[in-house]
Amino acid sequence: MRHRGIFYLVNALLALGVVLLFLQIKDIEPLPPQEREKPEEIFSVSDKKQRFLAALAPVVGRVHDDLMQRYLQVQRWLEQGRKQEAIAKLKLEYKVDTDPELLQALKPHPPSVALAQAAMESAWGTSRFFVEANNVFGVWSFNSHEARIAAGEKRGEKTIWVRKYDSLEASVRDYYRLLGRSAAFKEFRQLRMRSDDPHELVKKLHRYSEKSHAYGEELSAVIKYNEFTRFDGEGY
């Protein structure tokens, strides 16, 4: 009987301990669930290129077509001696004096050239400039009053800035405008009046990059390997 009493006492104490432990656990606030970190999306080279072209090829094509229509319109105005005031404004904008120089400035080059430059300058749409600033072509900014972001490098003690655009289309239009009015690309403009061959045109873009003439060779290789001339349409 004595042993049986001790047995019941031990069981009662154990039961009481379990109850007390349960009550303590209820009073403890549960820890917030840990959010699982999502792994960064990893794309193959092929996927990256497809995403780049899906985003940019339609934009480049649309801008090119718009600029070509403007070029043909201005060409008709000059032939007919019309719209002198509008022509004067365009000459001022593009920093030219003569009618032939204006046509050189306005004629757009093939989309294949623009896409090759975009691919190289933005690392197929993965550069910080492309993602954060819609800056497709790595265009620098020298105006502190315009929208821009700091680059990750400097020239001596000076910070390099690149332009920030509201859209990819705004970036593409500014790029065509840059090549149409900068003195650095005068030979390029002269050549595109005589030829629409992208592999010839890129040879005159050596001043766009510190790579100099090797830059044109790389652009030509990008155009050929990725068959970018398929975006040039029947006119090319």
Where are the regions that the model predicts?
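Catalytic cores of secreted/periplasmic lytic hydrolases that degrade extracellular macromolecules
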Residues: R2-A116, M120-Y236
